[in-house]
């Protein structure tokens, strides 16, 4: 262990900007998430859009079920660096991209029943679990720019457009409306979904 002067010189040599990760705190939080998953039966997934430091994926993979991806590059990163469950959602898919996603993903969420009708059969044939995103039309956000339930949003199927006749083959419903919010907002959203 060097002196403060030596440490400072080393620190000043670090290129900026740089991100520091306290691995002990990261692992402490991961243990909490693993406990939540065990206690509830929920699968806890890493949202790569928020944290894609793949150097830590082996550590994260010891505690979480897998990742969420918003496209082919994040899905590939998940497959290559963590190798656990790989879930993907995008508002729109291109056919060639969906084919590549189906080869590496475990679960694909469609944004509309039109997407499900267009791509569902080929996705299921690849052995991929499929879901559909719903829009609970219940805003819990303070800022419309971050609110997927804001008026005019095209994220997810609204109740007026919901098709019970097209549920066969879907494994679940997906909603994503909570960003840095607590249980109160989740309770309101769940009530709207029910």
Predicted regions and their residues:
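Generic N-terminal amphipathic, Lys/Arg-enriched alpha-helix
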Residues: 1-21
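N-terminal glycine-rich anion-binding loops that anchor highly charged ligand groups
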Residues: 2-6, 28-32, 38, 43-51
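A short alpha-helix capping/helix-coil boundary motif
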Residues: 10-14, 34-37, 52-56
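Active-site anion-handling motifs in enzyme catalytic cores
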Residues: 25
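Active-site-proximal beta-alpha core segment in soluble small-molecule metabolic enzymes
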Residues: 43-194
């Amino acid at each position: 262990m060097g002196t403060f002067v030596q440490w400072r010189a080393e620190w000043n040599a670090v290129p900026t900007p740089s991100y520091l990760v306290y691995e002990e705190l990261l692992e402490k939080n991961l243990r909490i998430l693993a406990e939540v998953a065990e206690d509830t039966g929920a699968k806890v997934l890493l949202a790569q859009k928020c944290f894609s430091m793949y150097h830590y994926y082996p550590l994260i993979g010891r505690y979480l079920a897998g990742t969420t991806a918003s496209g082919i590059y994040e899905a590939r990163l998940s497959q290559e660096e963590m190798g656990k469950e790989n879930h993907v959602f995008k508002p729109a898919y291109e056919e060639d991209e969906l084919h590549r996603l189906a080869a590496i993903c475990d679960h694909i969420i469609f944004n509309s029943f039109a997407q499900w009708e267009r791509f569902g059969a080929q996705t299921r044939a690849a052995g991929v679990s499929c879901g559909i995103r719903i829009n609970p039309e219940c805003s819990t956000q303070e800022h419309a720019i971050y609110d997927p339930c804001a008026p005019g949003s095209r994220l997810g199927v609204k109740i007026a457009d919901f098709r019970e006749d097209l549920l066969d083959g879907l494994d679940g419903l997906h909603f994503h409306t909570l960003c840095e919010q607590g249980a109160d907002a989740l309770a309101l959203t769940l009530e709207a979904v029910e």
